[in-house]
Structures are given as structure tokens and as C-alpha cells.
């Protein structure tokens, strides 16, 4: 799940329009038993009822069968179940999208890739007239450390955009430690 969240964090902070394919917001899997690309075209898993809530049609009339076994079975992975869980991928995605919408620098701002010595960490800045967002992504399964040149913003506060808590004060050569597959969205204020 950490890799899925990391990938979606990158999707929402890199330049361009983020595209979420149906089912990605709940971690819906593929039916690898189906030929060609049909494995990714299974019915949306809305709830744990008949046909996963996708259709009232007879099961045989569906374009593709619902995923009914394994890790991605509709009884386990569906919208209704995740709506009840505040820590679910669906609710996390909703918060991620809402946070992105609240910060014009994400998606509309000027993008600047930072180049730390540690290439396991992908750091970049998104800047607009309204705000500056420092996005950090640890692409490694290990704890990673790096130093970033943030002298331009020395003395300003770093605010975690999800928790709204102060992360720290910017120093010219900021030392950052990220847990495996961790990501941070930090506003520079």
C-alpha cells in the first residue's frame, strides 16, 4: 500500500493533469485470467452485493466477470467498505485530491526539479503566485537521507500540507530523512 500511495503522491505533484483510471482510487486489481487488455476492464466494485453493485443484469450478460477471488475480490475491495474506513485508500485519495486543489502551485505552478546527491529521493518544487510546495518522495525500500539546497527560503517555515503542522524551519542546507516509500508535501511559508 505504501508504494501505491507514493505513486499517487507523485502523480498529484508532478506537472500535468493527473489521470486516475476507475478502480485505482480503491486499489482495485486486475483479472489476469482474462485475455489481452480485458483484465483491466472488469466491472467497478461498488459494494459486496451482486455483480459488485456494477449492474443489475444477469452475471452472464456482463462484459467481463467481476473479480470474485484473491486479494482484489469485490467482497474485500469495494467502495462501500472503504467509505466506512477513515484510513482506506479511497479516503486517503479524496484527501490527496482535496489537498492538491487547495494549492495552486500543484498542477499550475512552475516546476523545479531539485538534484540531491541521493538519487533515491525525488524532490521538487512547485511554485505559483499563491504558494510554494516542496514535494519529496523516497523511491527506496530503505530509510534515505539527503541534503537540499534551500538557501533561497532560509528562515521560512515548512508546513506539512496534510497535517497542517510545522515540519521545521528552512536552513540553507536542509537535511531530510524519509522512511521507506515515504512522501512529504511541505508548504514553504
Can you name each region flagged by the protein language model?
Residues 51-52, 166-168:
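A short acidic, often aromatic-flanked loop/helix-cap motif at beta-alpha or helix-coil junctions
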Residues 1-133, 139-147:
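Loop/helix patches that line or flank the sugar-binding groove of alpha-linked glycan CAZymes
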Residues 96, 158, 181:
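A residue-level signal for conserved active-site and pocket-lining positions in enzyme catalytic cores
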Residues 47, 114, 149-151, 179, ...:
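A structural detector for beta-sheet-dominated domains
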Residues 48, 162-165:
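Residues at the C-termini of beta-strands that transition into short coil/loop
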Amino acid at each position: 500500500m505504501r508504494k501505491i500511495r507514493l505513486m499517487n503522491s507523485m502523480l498529484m505533484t508532478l506537472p500535468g493533469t493527473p489521470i486516475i483510471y476507475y478502480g485505482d482510487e480503491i486499489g482495485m486489481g486486475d483479472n489476469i485470467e482474462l485475455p489481452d487488455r480485458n483484465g483491466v476492464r472488469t466491472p467497478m466494485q461498488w459494494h459486496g452485493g451482486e455483480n459488485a453493485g456494477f449492474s443489475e443484469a444477469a452475471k452472464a450478460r456482463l462484459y467481463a466477470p467481476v473479480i470474485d477471488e484473491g486479494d482484489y475480490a469485490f467482497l474485500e475491495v469495494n467502495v462501500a467498505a472503504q467509505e466506512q474506513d477513515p484510513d482506506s485508500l479511497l479516503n486517503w485519495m479524496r484527501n490527496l485530491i482535496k489537498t492538491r486543489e487547495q494549492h495552486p502551485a500543484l498542477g499550475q505552478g512552475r516546476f523545479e526539479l531539485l538534484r540531491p546527491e541521493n538519487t533515491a529521493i525525488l524532490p521538487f518544487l512547485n511554485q505559483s503566485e499563491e504558494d510554494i510546495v516542496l514535494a519529496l518522495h523516497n523511491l527506496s525500500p530503505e530509510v534515505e537521507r539527503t541534503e537540499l539546497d534551500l538557501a533561497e527560503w532560509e528562515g521560512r517555515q515548512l508546513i506539512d500540507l496534510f497535517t497542517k503542522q510545522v515540519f521545521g524551519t528552512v536552513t540553507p542546507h536542509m537535511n531530510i530523512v524519509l522512511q521507506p516509500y515515504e512522501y512529504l508535501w511541505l508548504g514553504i511559508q
